[in-house]
A protein has these predicted regions:
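C-terminal "cap" of GNAT-fold acetyltransferases
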Residues: 3-6, 138, 145-152, 157-158, ...
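Residue-level recognition of the GNAT/N-acetyltransferase active site
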Residues: 112, 143-145
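Conserved acetyl-CoA-binding loop-helix of GNAT-fold acetyltransferases
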Residues: 111, 117-130, 134, 153-157
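Acetyl-CoA-dependent GNAT
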Residues: 16, 24-107, 112-113, 125-127, ...
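Conserved, well-structured beta-alpha core segment at the onset of a catalytic domain
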Residues: 1-17, 84, 89
Length: 185
């Protein structure tokens, strides 16, 4: 599978030789907003809500996964795609299929800091969606941190809806948010 999106980049299946380049990408980001979780336990009812909160200053956040995790993801992958320009990797997406074969789970959707806002993430997500269609998976789910407001906005812009969270999901104990989209089969 190779898709040419412009003269700027190509999306293709990753090879093991792409891993070092993926690991070299600067995946940090800056944000002025986060999703803050509010939990209320009143008279036997637990209510959980998220709200957008503006931070007092710009916050730089490092990618939540350890580099060794990408090698493990490569070994366990169902789908691993890269976006490249002139043979240089600019971003990647890693997806696995859940045990019930009902969900294409995007664990990593990453674009190097210098290459953002050039539709690379959109192209990677579009190829992941096509892959899920071909695999006859009815749902595509993307995970991101509550701190990753740019990632949250990206998911919402692409029609994914908030469908859940997991407290202390990442190694650094950040909360994971899950955004999903039904796949037309």
């Amino acid at each position: 599978m190779t898709s040419i999106y412009s003269t700027k980049f190509v999306v293709r299946e990753a090879t093991e030789n792409d891993l070092p380049a993926c690991l070299q990408l600067d995946l940090s980001y800056e944000t002025e907003y986060v999703w803050q979780m509010d939990v209320r336990d009143e008279e036997g009812t637990i209510a959980v809500g998220f709200r957008t909160v503006r931070l007092p200053r710009l916050m730089r956040v490092v990618y939540p996964r350890e580099p060794a995790g990408l090698t493990i993801a490569w070994q366990k992958r169902d789908c691993f795609l890269v976006a490249e320009t002139s043979g240089v990797v600019r971003g990647y997406i890693v997806m696995r299929v859940d045990a019930g074969r009902t969900n294409a789970w995007v664990s990593d959707l990453a674009v190097g800091r210098a290459w953002r806002r050039q539709k690379i993430g959109s192209a990677l997500l579009a190829e992941a969606y096509r892959w899920a269609q071909k695999a006859k998976l009815p749902r595509l789910t993307v995970e991101t941190q509550t701190k990753n407001y740019p990632g949250i906005s990206f998911c919402q812009k692409h029609g994914l809806f908030f469908c859940g969270f997991n407290d202390r999901y990442y190694a650094n104990h950040d909360i994971a948010l899950f955004f999903a989209q039904n796949v037309r089969l």
